[in-house]
């Protein structure tokens, strides 16, 4: 079975391939079928944005899996404007950041927060299957199982 992954991110492709290993699935990416259009993600949660993307890419393919993620720092209140949340690449209403700009921005923010923060992701996943949407989202329990430390310096291994 062919499934479109609504992403151009190689890490997300690998993640889903690993998660669904053993199933008879051939993953197709947006690049494979030359889709360059992107939906406007106006959701208020990772799940809502995943649904928006799944419906949008469902125009091009019968079965689609989409994922959206929010990054959160325990040291910041959820309402704090510095909280990345859904705006990991566009913090504080900034223009979209490149990878290098994003590393620089978050390194400086984390330095201001003491040099180290406890971070966690909340994932939203949506599946479009011939016009029917199914979705789910991580909950606050992810804070206990999926936490990691971020420091104010980029890893030297990031290019490996």
PLM region spans:
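Anionic-ligand binding patches
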Residues: 2-4, 11-160
């Amino acid at each position: 079975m062919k499934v479109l992954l609504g992403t151009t991110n190689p890490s997300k492709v690998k993640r889903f391939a690993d998660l669904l290993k053993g199933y008879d699935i051939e993953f197709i990416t947006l690049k494979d079928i030359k889709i360059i259009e992107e939906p406007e993600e106006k959701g208020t949660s990772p799940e809502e944005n995943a649904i928006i993307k799944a419906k949008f890419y469902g125009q091009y393919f019968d079965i689609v899996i989409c994922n959206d993620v929010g990054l959160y720092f325990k040291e910041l209140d959820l309402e704090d404007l510095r909280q990345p949340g859904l705006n990991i690449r566009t913090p504080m209403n900034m223009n979209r950041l490149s990878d290098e700009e994003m590393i620089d921005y978050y390194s400086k923010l984390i330095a201001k927060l003491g040099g180290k923060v406890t971070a966690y992701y909340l994932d939203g996943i949506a599946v479009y299957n011939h016009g029917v949407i199914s979705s789910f989202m991580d909950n606050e329990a992810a804070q206990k199982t999926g936490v990691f430390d971020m420091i104010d310096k980029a890893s030297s291994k990031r290019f490996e």
